[in-house]
Swiss-Prot record:
Summary of the function given for this chain in its UniProt record: Catalyzes the transfer of an acetyl group from acetyl-CoA to tetrahydrodipicolinate.
GO BP terms in the entry: diaminopimelate biosynthetic process; lysine biosynthetic process via diaminopimelate
Family affiliation: Belongs to the transferase hexapeptide repeat family. DapH subfamily.
Organism: Ligilactobacillus salivarius (strain UCC118)
Pfam family, one: Hexapep_2
Annotated SUPFAM superfamilies: Trimeric LpxA-like enzymes
Protein name (database record): 2,3,4,5-tetrahydropyridine-2,6-dicarboxylate N-acetyltransferase
PANTHER family on file: 2,3,4,5-TETRAHYDROPYRIDINE-2,6-DICARBOXYLATE N-ACETYLTRANSFERASE, ACETYLTRANSFERASE
Gene3D superfamilies reported in the protein's UniProt record: Hexapeptide repeat proteins (2.160.10.10), Malonyl-CoA ACP transacylase, ACP-binding (3.30.70.250)
Superkingdom: Bacteria
Matches recorded under NCBIfam families: DapD_Ac
Amino acid sequence: MAKLDAHDIIRTIAESKKKTPVKVYVKGDLNSLDVPSNVETYFTDNVGVMFGDWADVEPILKDSSVESYHLENDGRNTGVAMVDKKKFNARIEPGAIIRDQVEIGDNAVVMMGAVINIGAEIGEGSMIDMGAVLGGRAIVGKNCHIGAGTVLAGVVEPPSAQPVVIEDDVLIGANAVVLEGVRVGKGAVVGAGAVVTKDVEPYTVVMGMPAKKVKDVSQVDDSKTEIVDDLRKL
């Protein structure tokens, strides 16, 4: 997939047909319903389920042949679809929210509650832990660990901003924030809760708000920065 810049993403959202996807369980004389071809149905004579856009489904539900229905909906006028997770050779746990037009490398891991926005990239073997947020166009290299609750700032608006870049073999602790335009160098470690406002040199450890260098990675026990390959096996 070609890399998206901010203007590509803005154009995609602006020009997309906004949709309100719904799933409806319906009961009634279903054979009498006039259902347009763009609404997907699985009907028996008197019960069934429909999938479609609310603009197309709502008129059907007003038909007198419908006795009752139960509607499920999780978005309104959405501009970017959710990605087809089956296309990735990665481990993606239930509850991860991943929008379309992202890249996820082989053997990557995306944990429950993680949010991956349009244009983001995750390198092979990297883990995005629970509740982490990768904003639009955020780039994570190979064999990284992005800790639970961490935010890599998105850069769709303003469009001139440069994306966050996390180079290979980086470990970021829980609840850190990396601001737009920041590059975290190869093999670096970012402490939990840090707010990273400036580039981080390779193989250094930064902590605090704002994050500052406290030592080199060579001074840290290997057990505290180990990336476990077994967690990435499929």
